[in-house]
Amino acid sequence: CHWKNKDGVDIYGYGGDFNKYDGSDNNFNDNGLISPDRVPNPHAYEVAYFYQDIWTTPADLAKGEINIFNEYFFRDLSAYYMEWQLLANGEVVQTGIVSDLKVAPQQTVKVQLPIDTKNICPCKELLLNVSYKLKAAETLLPAGTAIAYEQLSIRDYKAPELKLENVQASNLPVIVPSILDNDQNYLIVKGENFSMDFNKHNGYLCRYDVNGMQMMEDGSELTPNFWRAPTDNDFGAGLQRKYAVWKNPELKLTSLRHAVENDQAVVRAEYDMKSVGGKLFLTYTINNKGAVKVTQRMEADKSKKVSEMFRFGMQMRMPVNFNEVEYYGRGPVENYSDRNHGAKLGKYRQTVEEQFYPYIRPQ
């Protein structure tokens, strides 16, 4: 219910928020499909996907052949039309409409779409989106409402090898980044249009300016990260305690080296992680335009009995004016690795605020 906490801030309360003596299911009755402000939770879209009554499966996608199954018991699909899109790395390259769907109840029909993949780069991921829409309005649903959809993979994504090369204009020499090691606190890498500072006491990248633009928030550092906020299920399994050693493990800098290799600046930092029985290695490769490739590698002592970790990555804070995100992945709704059927692969552009969903209690 709508509630105010002890500081007078509006919150959505659940069992246990009101007193300590009444029987309660805690947040168990507050994790449904619709939030108290009547906004669908992201998992509502997952449920909607599985509630649909028209299912599309591949027959021979290389030939554009798909199977359409009508799960309805008492109506055919004549009230709907199908829109399809062919996507290459998230970009729509072909579209079409099938207006006559002759599929009886509980029957499957094969349909051939005029898909042509011959002139599409073989390195790109190919996806087929299909959507079934109403030809005419029905009760509360206007004409054109999508009542079922599917996304089929024609060609899987192949991640390119992550290479960092210098950018060379025609007939102009490459200006190799210089490394300044005459400051007591900072190792500085300078290029034609960029400057980067590494903290000599912990080895972390702590300043990154390109073309006069500050890429990192003042006081921020690019640091290793092995933690995320535990979810409700994590708490139920006690993972916040089992994995606690990874929340802020000690990272003792044992080596900070630098060199110019292949006309690029390279900074290497090594760390001892006694609390988890491991060693961490960070390598920063910087080209002539200030682009950075960061590699993080960990060596674990197999004789040490250490818990698993929530995640393995890096984090930093960016200036507030970096408030838009463009990505190729699942969206536009928030989704998990095991709850993403309702989120299609595509190219999406969102604000940072739109990337966040305020779960009352993340499950």
Q: How does the language model describe each region?
A:
Residues T139-L152:
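Edge beta-strands of extracellular beta-sandwich domains
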Residues K63, A79-E83, L127, Y186, ...:
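Exposed beta-strand and adjacent loop surfaces of beta-rich binding modules
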Residues P114-C123, E138, S153-Q363:
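Beta-strand/loop-rich accessory regions of lumenal/periplasmic or secreted enzymes
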Residues R75-M82, G96, K304-G313:
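Short, hydrophobic/aromatic beta-strand segments
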Residues Y81, L87-K124, Y132, L140:
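Intrinsically disordered, low-complexity Pro/Gly/Ser/Thr-rich segments with frequent PxxP/GP/PP motifs
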Residues N70-F74, A300-K302:
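Short amphipathic, basic-aromatic surface patches that mediate peripheral association
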Residues C1-E65, F73-S78, E83-V93:
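Extended substrate-binding grooves/exosites of carbohydrate-active enzymes
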Residues V47, I68, V130, N193, ...:
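Conserved, mostly hydrophobic/aromatic
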